[in-house]
Structure formats: C-alpha cells, structure tokens
Amino acid sequence: MGTHGKRIDMAENRSKFSTLLDQLNIKQPEWNALTTSEEAIEFAQKVGYPILVRPSYVLSGAAMRVSYDEKTLKDTLDLAVSVSSEYPVVITKFFTDAREVECDGVCDGENVFIGAIVEHIENAGIHSGDATMAIPPQTVSNEVISKIEDYTNKIALALKIFGPFNVQYLVKNSEVYVIECNLRSSRSMPYVSKSRGINLMRLAAEVIMGGKIPKRLMNLPLGNYVSIKAPMFSFMRLDKADPILGVEMSSTGEVACIGEDFPDALMKSLEAADMNVPIDGGNILISVGGDELKNQVIPLAKKLKNLGFTIFATEDTKKALNKNNIEAVKLYKVHEYGMEPNIMQCLQEGRIDMVINIPLPTTVKEKFKTIMEDEYKIRRMAVDYNIPVIINLQLAKAVIDAIKNTREKKVKIKSLNEYHQTLKEVYW
C-alpha cells in the first residue's frame, strides 16, 4: 500500500533525487555530499558563501546550519558529523533574498492533486515550521506559479507517488529551484486542507487504499479569500532561549486564520498566536545592525511615523532615521546601563509596545560581540515582558501594512463553514 519504499528513498537520498531532477530538467541549488572539512571548504569557495549544511535524513531541520564564512563552516560541519556520522553531510548553496514556496498534494500514480501553493512571508532561511504562510501566494508571479505547478506534477509522477507529498521550492529572480520533496503528510497539510475545503488526509488515505482522486476535484478554484498560518512559540517558558529564527525549527504550535484579504488574515492569525500588535498607536523600538539593514528599515519607519507611532532607537539607528527626516527618541543600549533613557528600563516599565529587531548576519558575530549580546537581551526582555517582537524584515513590513488595513476597515469574523459555503465543493 502507498508509495513504494524505493521511491521514498529516491526522494530522501539527495544524490538519487538530484539525478531525477536533472532528468526532468528541473533546477536545484548547487550541492555536494562531503565527509571532510577540506572538501567542504573547497566546495564553499567554489559556489560562494553562504552555504547550508545538513546531515541526511533529518526532521525539523535538526543540526542544519547556515554558514557565512570558513570558521562557522568548520564549526557547523563538526556538529553535523557528530549527529549523523554514518552518512555524508549535504552542503548546499544558500540563496539570500529568495522566496520560499511549497506545495502540499496527493498523487494516485496517474493524477496529481495540488492542494495549494503556499508562500512563506519571510524570505528563505526560516524553517517551514516557523514560517508565516499565505494561501494564495502574494508576491510570486503567475508565470512562477505555473512553473511550480508543472514541476510538482512532473516530480510526483516520476516518483510514482501513491499518497501524500510536499515539495519545497526557492524562487530567485523568477527562477524556480527545488529544495526537496517529502513523501509524507507535512505539518502544513491540515492548514492547506481547511483553507481549500478539501481534506487532503482523507484523499491520501483513500489513494493509499487503492482509490483514485475524483476527477471533479482536479480543477476546483481557490476560495475568494486569503488564509494565513502563523507559528506559536514557547520562548516565555524557555528561560534564556533566544527568540531568533533560522533553518532549525523552534515553534511548538501553529494557528491559521482566514480573512477577506492578506492584511486581514495576517492580523487575525497574529492575534490568534497571542501576538498583541498595537493597532491604535504607541511606541515602537527599532534596533537593526549594519548600514544595509538600516537602509532597508527606513521605508518601514516612515510608514510607522505616518501611522502616528513614536519611534525609539539606539544612537546609530536614530542617526540613520534622522538623515531620512524621521524623528526618533534616542535610547541608550543595554550595555550602557545607568545612562537614561535605557532600553532595559523602557522595556521593564512597559513604555515599548512593539520591538522590531533585525539581527546581524552570523558572519559578523565575532566582530560585534557586544552588539549581538545587546540584541539578544532586547529580544529576550521583550519576550519576558510579553512585548511583541519581530525579527524579520518581510514580516515587519506585512505587519505594518496590516495595522494600516485594520484601522481603515472593520474586521469581519466568520466561521470556517461560512467561508467554505462560498466554495464550489467541500470534500471533507
């Protein structure tokens, strides 16, 4: 019953799956399976940093790391080998500023049903279990969506899947690359099922038992609404844990909400995840490292000012904002304790309503150790005092747009059944 074990291994074994993608003429990030530090360094020098290091056969991104330079690569490789010494470590070129998209579906060996194409709000580099997701995709083009549908069909049929599957993609400059294909029910499948009104788990079980996908389901349109899946974390219960996200999964749960449009659904999902975003105004602390990040946060700060928020910032960030005619209240850094007003003091006294802290890349941690410690303390204190903290630029932009949208139009609450009643068919 179900997908043959050899086909599952073909998808899980990076070398075999890579060969299949080459045969299908489908792009993938450059990669290699290596066993020594010397080989890894040589490969990294060839393709360029950053690179992603991961052991074979892992779940939830266990032992996965992004390496930005030779030193962090050696440290990461040592960790990966200790986790899975029997298998070569897979090292892959890591794309910065790429979008991540995935598909959940069911195949009966002849027909491929794509439940939904799901776009991550955050750029690639955040584990799918920690990512905020949107159905339908909000930023990728129709051309890219068509290509993803085509690739998904080709992969599912080539693997002779009988049951559920999940395919993850990278989108960079309109080029589509396959990350991996999992021949199982993914954690996002319940979310996709409720969004579509089609129970993919039921469909997969029927196929595994020898059934076929009903033809009438193949071309059903999406509903005229947007659904968002948001992660939930337990950082408040994990003393001293850094609430920062990466390729290794940190979330302990998730919520999903449906709205009339993207901002509506996002705000509902954040509220459901106990993230108390200030809607009516307040004080926002912006703390970012490096000139590039400061330049990227300028448009967000302008939107916040236009919405009536008061911006607090440390000295360098304040200077960058002032250069762009954005007023900000200066706060002294955490390690400058005793100087007032200080970040720690403002967080403790509840004078900050939301924190936007975009961390520095790993590659500069050694150079800016004090700054990194400050950033950690800001994030940690925000969690301890139940202050919303956003550590991703794309999510910050989406949240600010959602605040504006929520002010302009009344939020409508509907049951899942009410949304499903607008669909052509519900298969549950």
Stretches found by the model and what they are:
Residues 2, 20, 24-25, 47-50, ...:
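ATP-dependent carboxylate activation and anion-phosphoryl transfer catalytic cores
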Residues 285, 308-320:
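Short internal beta-strands
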Residues 43-47, 271-284, 304-305, 346-353:
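Glycine-rich phosphate/diphosphate-binding loops that line cofactor/substrate pockets in enzymes
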